[in-house]
């Protein structure tokens, strides 16, 4: 749903085929059978496998993959491990690693409303210029998350998905890579993205003005100013 505005915008869909899917445990996708006997933890391997399985099931021929936040991190891993499978890769709000700045134990406790605390955690990452309606739509998506899912996602983001010392192996001659980060993002800061980009010869990087951690949902119109030129360059 975070990409729904791009999916509904003729400026995008008249030229490009756009597919977005809910990961298992997220949105309208259910957890795997037997989920009640396990603790959900997203890993680099399982996330990478899910993206590649979707592309295979849809019979996509070297698609362009774009992801944001943890989705941006997995895009970097796709560039590291599977670059030849893609026409281009776009990582939004992405870096090889971010130092944790919050306590994830608060995200799954019986005495705390999980959805509301998740939304509270990320609310400050939205740029002040973002429309009020779009801001609260973005927060609502986090309020609707299943118990422990955001905490499990952050296991990948904070622990398992550490790509330091790995991104320097990315070869943009095989697959072009674009990094775009909002200036108001203090989770993945512009400095984090620029530090990562400095290790990747040939990468194209841009800091997006008046945007935060969720550009495609917090201010879709502003995001189009940045993403449409990238798509045009790829096409």
Task: For the regions a language model picked out, list residue spans one by one.
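Conserved alpha/beta-hydrolase "acid-adjacent" motif
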Residues: 186-192
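Catalytic active-site module of serine/aspartate enzymes centered on a nucleophile-bearing elbow/loop
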Residues: 203-235
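The serine-hydrolase catalytic nucleophile loop
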Residues: 1-7
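Conserved alpha/beta-hydrolase catalytic His-Asp/Glu region
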Residues: 100-101, 114-172
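Flexible "cap/lid" loop of the alpha/beta hydrolase fold
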Residues: 76-117
């Amino acid at each position: 749903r975070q990409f729904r505005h791009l999916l509904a915008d003729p400026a995008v869909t008249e030229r490009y085929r756009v597919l977005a899917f809910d990961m298992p445990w997220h949105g309208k996708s259910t957890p795997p059978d037997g989920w009640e006997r396990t603790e959900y933890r997203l890993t680099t391997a399982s996330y990478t496998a899910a993206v590649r399985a979707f592309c295979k099931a849809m019979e996509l021929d070297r698609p362009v993959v774009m992801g944001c936040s943890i989705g941006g991190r997995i895009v970097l891993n796709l560039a590291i491990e599977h670059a030849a499978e893609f026409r281009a890769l776009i990582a939004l709000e992405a870096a090889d690693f971010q130092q944790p700045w919050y306590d994830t134990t608060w995200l799954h406790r019986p005495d705390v409303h999980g959805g509301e605390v998740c939304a509270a955690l990320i609310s400050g990452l939205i740029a002040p210029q973002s429309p009020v309606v779009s801001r609260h739509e973005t927060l609502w998506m986090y309020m609707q998350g299943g118990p422990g899912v955001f905490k499990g996602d952050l296991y990948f983001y904070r622990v398992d998905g550490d790509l330091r010392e790995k991104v320097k192996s990315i070869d943009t001659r095989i697959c072009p890579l674009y990094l775009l980060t909002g200036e108001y993002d203090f989770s993945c800061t512009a400095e984090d993205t620029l530090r990562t980009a400095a290790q990747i010869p040939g990468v194209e990087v841009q800091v997006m003005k008046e945007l935060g951690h969720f550009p495609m949902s917090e201010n879709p119109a502003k995001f189009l100013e940045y993403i449409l030129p990238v798509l045009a360059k790829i096409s």
